Amino acid sequence: RSAQGMGKMERLLASYRGALEPSTPLGDLSGSLGHPVE
């Protein structure tokens, strides 16, 4: 996979997770990038 493609997917997952958990701090969302989102 290309690094760019992975970055897009990570941002997508972070946005999706943020939508599910609106109370999650932005710092936590940023920290979750680069790690598997369960």
Curated annotation (Swiss-Prot):
Keywords: Hormone, Neuropeptide, Secreted. Pfam families: Crust_neuro_H (PF03858). GO terms for molecular function: hormone activity. It is found in: Secreted. GO terms for cellular component: extracellular region. InterPro entries: Crust_neurhormone_H (IPR005558). One of its GO terms (biological process) is neuropeptide signaling pathway. It comes from the Eukaryota. Produced by the medulla terminalis X-organ in the eyestalks and transported to the sinus gland where it is stored and released. Residues 18-38 are annotated as: Disordered. This is CHH precursor-related peptide.
